[in-house]
Structures are given as C-alpha cells and as structure tokens.
Amino acid sequence: YAKYMEHIGAGTRLAHTLIKPLYRLNRPYIVLALMFLLNMGLSICVPNPLSLALLMMVTIYPVLLRLGVSPVGAAAVIATGHLMDVGPGAVSTLLIAKTLNIPVPNYFVGYQLRLYFLVAVVTAVAHFLWQRYRDRLDAPMDVGDCESISEAPIGPKSYMLFPLLPLCFILGFSQYGLPGVKMNVTLAMMLAFGIALLAELIRHRNLRTVLKSTTVFFEGMGNQFSYAVTLIIGGQVFAQGLVSLGLIDSLVSALQTLSLNSEGLTSVMGGGMLGLSMVTGSNVAPLFTLVPLVPNIVSNLGLDPITTMLGMQNGASLGLFLSPISPVMVGVAGVAHIKSVDLLKRTSIPVLVALITSCLGIWMLY
C-alpha cells in the first residue's frame, strides 16, 4: 500500500501539505526539530523506514538545506524519522500482537502510542541541540547537491487523505470507535486501496492505465510476502534449534539467578535487540527469531510479557540508526552524498537519548 501511495503521489502530497506552514519560520533548528516530529507522525502511516526516508529526502531535505542546516544534519533528522516501528501496519507490531494474542489496535493505542509521543518530543529536543552543536563545530559543507535530487510525483490535494485511511479504518472500527464492526489490518489496507483506485479512475478516466498501475501494489505485496515468509521460516528454525540445544532453559536459569524484575528484563532484552539490529542492519529479523520465545521465558520468571516485548521492539528499531549497514542509513547517505559513518555520528546521540527515554518511559508508564 505504501508503494502505491508513493506511485500516485499521495505520500508526497501529504508531506508537502504538512510542511507548508513551516516555510514561514526562519529558525533553522526549530524547523529541523518540527520536521523530525512531522516525520515521526508520518511514520505511523508509512511503515517502511527506507520508503519514508526517501520521500522526505525529496520534500524536507532541500528545505532544511536552504534554511542553513548542513547536509549531514538534515540527513540525520530524516534518517531517524522512522525512529520506532509502531502503528497498526508495522510488521513488528503485527508479530507482537499475534504472539500476545491481543488485538492490534489495543497494543498500538494502549502501549505504543503514549511512549511514542514521549520519545518523539525528547528526541526532537536532542536533535535540535546536537545538530546545532555539530553544525557550529564542523566545517561548512557544500549544499549544491540538493539540486541533483529528483522530484517525487505529487498527487491532487485530496490525495493527502489516502495514506491516513488504513489507520482511520483500523482505529475507527475498534473499541476506540465503532466496536460493533470488526476490521483487521488486511481488510483496512484493501479497502483503502480500493478507494484510492477509484479516485485514480476518476482522475485519469482511463481504465487500462489505472489497472496497469495496480502492478505497483501487487509487486510491493509480493516483495513483502517473500521477505516475511523467509523471516518466519528462518526464525522458527533458529528458535527450535535453540530450544533443542537447551539454550532457552539455560537463559531462563541465568535470568532467574540474576533475579531481574520486569524493568531489568526489559532493559536486558531491549539492549540485546539493539545490538542484534546494529549487527544485522535489520530490526525485523531479530524480532521474528526471538519474540516467539519470550512468552516461555517471562512465564518462568513470572513477569509481564507485554512490556518486555515493547522494550525489545523499540531496541530493535533504534538499532537501525546505529548501524552503518542498515538500508535506511545507506540509502539516505547515498542520496545526500555523504558517508554512512558521518551520518552515524549525527544519529548516535539522539538515538541513545531515545533509547534511555524509551526504557524510562516503559518503567514509568507501565
């Protein structure tokens, strides 16, 4: 669905509409912090970190450069815009909700959302201070490269609503809206896709052209399915291997020896996921491997599985922005014509602040 939104220019239209009020501000680093918050909001509707980052590179990046922010500072804010993998359409959210056997809207609204707002605000302040400090410290960089960034297609003004439709459907037809109607993520995506398809037909008045454009949707679906199936099979085989070797029993015994409480276990598991995500360059692969094992581990310890998995999910998400090999870091660095290592220097402090805030937030809120 995100790929189709990109194809018809709906995501670009939404970004342009939300960015427009910020043009009037002439305070570069205040705009930078606000752009980060905007990016965080859009990440709920665009569940792929790289897709969102590339969209922001053609919309937000030139604006920040013209205001006087350095290329590496602007790129750091854009790369970390998908800071935490949350929302009803996020793969990790669907995995954890299924493992816990709770509805996706309940997990999203009841656990993710409050923590998401807290981390977003604190990290925006960290970006404001860190990027301003580094820009003053570092030598000025050439900003002419923004001219080489190709423009993304932009749809009509009404198209800005389409990226929001799945989220509206999922939350609207739940206990937070109309509880009498049940709607899962798949149905919400397909219904929103049908509405967007009808709008495209009205816009172009050419059935063949519109139907041909649907290949973008199904190609994106196929790519995601192949990726997910590979992760599921690989994760289950790996997890079963750990159980067969007795490593899970050894881990439970070690954790019992440490006498960890819920906060301690959340920190340990979240830190472990952060490290795995940094090494692999993926936040989803480690989760598919270890999340199915968590209920057994926490049940033996008598602790809450939800907060543990929430900490693991956030740790895995944040690890992406501390890894120079993650697709989003490589992609943004390539478009901005900077080194991944230089980008990593700019993302590290805000991401570590986000990690600490996430841990403290879980302890305080749950």
What spans do the regions from the language model cover?
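Hydrophobic alpha-helical transmembrane segments of multi-pass integral membrane proteins
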Residues: Y23-T59, L231-G235, Q256-N296, N300-L301, ...
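Re-entrant/interfacial helical elements at transmembrane boundaries that shape
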Residues: R13-H16, L50-V63, A90-N101, L251, ...
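Core transmembrane alpha-helical segments of multi-pass membrane transporters/permeases
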Residues: Y1-R13, V185-D249
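Juxtamembrane helix-boundary/capping and inter-helix hinge elements in multi-pass membrane proteins
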Residues: H7-A10, K20-L25, L64-V72, A97-N106, ...
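Long, contiguous bundles of hydrophobic transmembrane helices that form the permeation core
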Residues: V109-V216, V335, D342-K345, Y366
